Amino acid sequence: MKQKAFCLLLFLFICESLFEQRILEKEIYRLPTTWELFVNALIFVESRGDENAVGSKNDVGVLQITPIYVEEVNRILGKNIYNLEDRYSKEKSLEMFEIVQMYHNPQKNVDKAIKLHNPRAGKQYAVKIKRQMDYLRTK
C-alpha cells in the first residue's frame, strides 16, 4: 500500500513538474504581439535603441521625445510626474509613450499610433516602421 501511495505521489510530482515546464516554455517562446513589434520597430527607427540619441528638434532618447510630449503626458496625468531628463530613460520614455497612446489611442491602432507619435512625419516614416516590424516578425 505504501509503495502504491509513493508511486502515485511520485507520478503527481512528475506531472506537475512537466506542466510547470510547459508553462515556462510557452512563456519563453511566446510570439510578440503586434503592439510589441510596433514599439520595438519605433524604437529602432527613432534611435536604433540609443537612450542618449539627440534629434534636430530637441527630441531625445529611444523614442525621440520632445518637451511638448512631456507636457502632454503631464497634462493627461493632471500633475507634473515626468520631466525633460526622463526622456533619456528608456523605461520612462516607454511609460510616457504608453500614457499618450492609452489616452488618445486605447485600441492600440498602429497607424494612429504612428501619427500620434510623430504627427508631422510623412508616409515614408510609417513605411519605415512597418518594414522594421516585418523584419522583427521574421527574426
Q: Where are these predicted regions, by residue range?
A:
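Short, flexible beta-strand-to-coil junctions
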Residues: 2, 118-120
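Short, surface-exposed glycine/acidic/tryptophan-bearing loops
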Residues: 53-77, 116
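Alpha-helical segment that forms one wall of the substrate-binding/catalytic cleft
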Residues: 67-112, 121-136
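Alpha-helical scaffolds flanking conserved acidic
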Residues: 34-41, 107-116
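Export/targeting segments at the very N-terminus of extracytoplasmic proteins
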Residues: 2-7, 11-51, 76-77, 90-102, ...
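Alpha-helical elements of the RecA-like P-loop NTPase motor core of helicases
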Residues: 51-52, 127
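Residues that flank catalytic or metal-binding motifs in active/ligand-binding sites
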Residues: 38, 58-61, 125
